[in-house]
Amino acid sequence: MGLRGLLCVCLVSLLALQAVAAQGSPTRNPKGGKKRMAVDAAVDGVVIRSLKVNCKVTSRFAHYIITSQVVNSADTAKEVSFNVEIPKTAFISDFAITADENAFTGDIKDKVTAWKQYRKAAISGENAGLVRASGRTMEQFSIHIIVGPRSKATFRLTYEEVLRRKLMQYDIVIKVKPQQLVQHFEIDVDIFEPQGIRKLDVEASFLPKELAAQLIKKSFSGKKGHVLFRPTVSQQQTCPTCSTTLLNGDFKVTYDVNRDDACDLLVANNYFAHFFAPQNLKKLNKNVVFVIDISSSMEGQKLKQTKEALHKILGDMRPGDYFDLVLFGSAVQSWKGSLVQASPANLEAARNFVQQFSLAGATNLNGGLLRGIEILNKAQQSLPELSNHASILIMLTDGEPTEGVMDRTQILKNVRDGIKGRFPLYNLGFGHDVDLNFLEVMSLENNGRVQRIYEDHDATQQLQGFYEQVANPLLRDVELLYPREAVSDLTQHRHKQYYEGSEIMVAGRIADHKLSSFKADVRAHGEGQEFMTTCLVDKEEMKKLLRERGHMLENHVERLWAYLTIQELLAKRMKLEGQEKANVSAKALQMSLAYQFVTPLTSMTVRGMTDQDGLEPIIDKPLDDYLPLEMVGPRKTFMLQASQPAPTHSSLDIKKLPDQVTGVDTDPHFLIHVPQKEDTLCFNINEEPGVVLSLVQDPDTGFSVNGQLIGNEAGSPGKHEGTYFGRLGIANPATDFQLEVTPQNITLNPGSGGPVFSWRDQAFLRQNEVLVTINRKRNLVVSVEDGGTFEVVLHRVWRGSAVRQDFLGFYVLDSHRMSARTHGLLGQFFHPFDYKVSNLHPGSDPTKTDATMVVKNRRLTVTRGLQKDYRKDPRHGAEVTCWFIHNNGDGLIDGIHTDYIVPDIF
């Protein structure tokens, strides 16, 4: 029987390594007795015959292969799934399925090519993708297939990563969750480290320590280490007669290497890797400023956990450290306004300050950061004894700038100009409301990094854990130097600081192939002295050393270099725009394809494996800022994929919006761009809250957009202070598509219990010919194949706003494919019409110009005025000059405005 891929929308973040039957549930088989007895490991006739994880680590480069064989012993075809969790830092490099003696292999191509193929077929509403959802540190890979009766299928997934040293160790984390007993289960880890292995430990969160010691074999000697976990079926059982499994959790291998020398050089096949982690250095004293968001959104558990973490961090300060605290809400306040020594008295006073501070309004992020920068800069300038300390700026926020300077480009410039490369900035984004991309760019531009703090019971530990990584700087201004003519394509080799327990890693090409030896010089500033060392490696000795690897990965140095280079290029492109960004992206894409890595710029399709509509599955790399979302409803009807970019024509690039605008926003002000006149008309509609107005109605297709008005303030009947759109209904009956949009939620097909999304979600939905992109906390774009493209803008209440409840704006991005019979308050203007303006003269308001307009055979008095386009800036908007038609658009719109009142949004 042939193999066909089924639709898979698996968007919940499960920490799992699975190969399970998609149908049925484990059947208990109690038979009594004290001894473990043979139980039926099949689930609905499907059994996992084997599940093996093989990991080979060579000089920090980890190569994983997960292989699973599933057997369908039933007389009918069964749907089975293969689900695994892999580290976010990893790149998938291969995937294959073997079934009925047929092999289906992965093919990596650039994302644009894959997406064109994918989108063309996906218009039907079906999903050919292998959707992966992000957890904290892992990503989920999932595929569903049909296995024929009395048949078997074998899955093989390969992925690679570079292990980073944190807190004195390297971590290999394998998620284990088979959900049923496995006949042959195995985790096999081989480690080869030329420096020699100093320690090797294993933890299995799902096993008691005593049992783990019995079942897990570990050994290390010299350069090699080995871990083997191979439980029998009876050892997997939760009880002697149970058919349920113990295997559910993390399998974690940790190790470290010897540090006899300050650095270690590795050369192979004209590539080199340099690992620098000197030991026994005196700790540098540090100057640290904590910049803390105390806006109202930090209320509750987040504030409590932040205070708890600060208390513990203050307790870890050393006497030679200097510090200060800056708080920002609507205003900015600092504890001392200058650095003070971490004396017992000052630390106690700081703890009291932390205990007592409270929330304060909006989010003046720019002001808080600049105050922190100012404190560090002044200390270095006015106190010479502090200039040799390691300065660090740490900022914690849970939201976006809503007070003071809010333009992100300006904030980035202000921070760059303030820091000027003197010290690193570490940004901590608390929860999923933060703009993590913005914070990451800011950190990257200032020699730091970003980390998300998840809203959970352990947020205090997350904050403290981050601080521990930067708490003990050992060197500053570290520079790793190589023979200029002998190397090329170096990865980052200058670092502001080196921290205890970490490691600096550099890789590059060796351009001079005739070198018999290779050296690296390291220069840095240490505690009270300059640090200098030279690392040297003989190529013949290295060849001899590498022969000891045996079966380990042969080209690991080159692939380590490629991995680091691609990661750095992907980070660099975030900071660039225009042609520079395009050039860096092209280089990252070229390397991703050359080394067959699935990165944010590439996709993998599985050749020869299709669903009933001929779609090949697609594997993509999710971005961290995209949230894992749960799909509710029939998966054949639509597909939601949080990791895919939107198609070109419906992707909303805020910076590239056209100047012309047609839409309706605020109280409600209608704007009609007339391209043939290169001008804009505008009018208001004055109606009561609760009234529903027809905005777009295409009788040829049935497509419609209706909007319901709300008052300025909730709960104030009879008090008319303006009306705004608080509910929109977008419908396309030909494809049974309905979308209800409010300032709180977006609901797909509300009449049939479809999924509900919040404005905190980043998502991409497809249903037949309609595509919807939700851009988190900003807008959503609806695009209809052979129809129009529309945008809904979210307006949030902000401090100082005259509007006291959230509302929506609606804009037309493209309407040229709508039928000539399209109508509605906006729809009637989708096709050309003419008017003439004459007799310009001062109006009743001497600051404005009145004129006579002839339109639709009617003569009107119109006024030159200003309205606003809120697509780029939902808070302040951009001014648009227009001719204002009075009296609810009378004379411009067909009929009168009450003709456009409809019973409901659908």
From Swiss-Prot:
Reproduce the UniProt comment on modification after translation: Heavy chains are linked to bikunin via chondroitin 4-sulfate esterified to the alpha-carboxyl of the C-terminal aspartate after propeptide cleavage. The S-linked glycan is composed of two 6-carbon sugars, possibly Glc or Gal.
What residues are glycosylation sites in this protein? 55, 583, 643, 648, 745
**Molecular function (Gene Ontology), one example:** serine-type endopeptidase inhibitor activity
- The propeptide segment or segments lie at 23-29, 668-906
Entries under SMART domains matching the protein: VIT (SM00609), VWA (SM00327)
Spell out the Gene3D superfamilies in the cross-references. von Willebrand factor, type A domain
Q: Among the record's GO biological process terms, what is one? A: hyaluronan metabolic process
Aspartate 1-(chondroitin 4-sulfate)-ester modified-residue sites: 667
Q: Where in the cell is it found?
A: Secreted
Q: Main site of residence?
A: secreted
In this chain the VWFA domain maps to 287-470
* Phosphoserine: residues bearing it: 124
Residue ranges of domain VIT in the record: 32-161
UniProt KW Transcription keyword: no
Give the record's GO CC terms: extracellular region
Show which residues constitute the signal peptide: 1-22
Q: Which InterPro entries match?
A: ITI_HC_C, ITIH, VIT, VWF_A, vWFA_dom_sf
Q: Mind telling me which residue stretches traverse the membrane in this protein?
A: none
User: What PANTHER family does UniProt report for this protein, alphabetically?
Assistant: INTER-ALPHA-TRYPSIN INHIBITOR HEAVY CHAIN FAMILY MEMBER (PTHR10338), INTER-ALPHA-TRYPSIN INHIBITOR HEAVY CHAIN H1 (PTHR10338:SF106)
Function field: May act as a carrier of hyaluronan in serum or as a binding protein between hyaluronan and other matrix protein, including those on cell surfaces in tissues to regulate the localization, synthesis and degradation of hyaluronan which are essential to cells undergoing biological processes.
Oligomer status and interactors: I-alpha-I plasma protease inhibitors are assembled from one or two heavy chains (HC) and one light chain, bikunin. Inter-alpha-inhibitor (I-alpha-I) is composed of ITIH1/HC1, ITIH2/HC2 and bikunin. Interacts with TNFAIP6 (via Link and CUB domains).
Protein family: Belongs to the ITIH family.
Q: What is this protein called?
A: Inter-alpha-trypsin inhibitor heavy chain H1
Which species is listed as the source? Bos taurus (Bovine)
The UniProt gene name for this protein comes to ITIH1
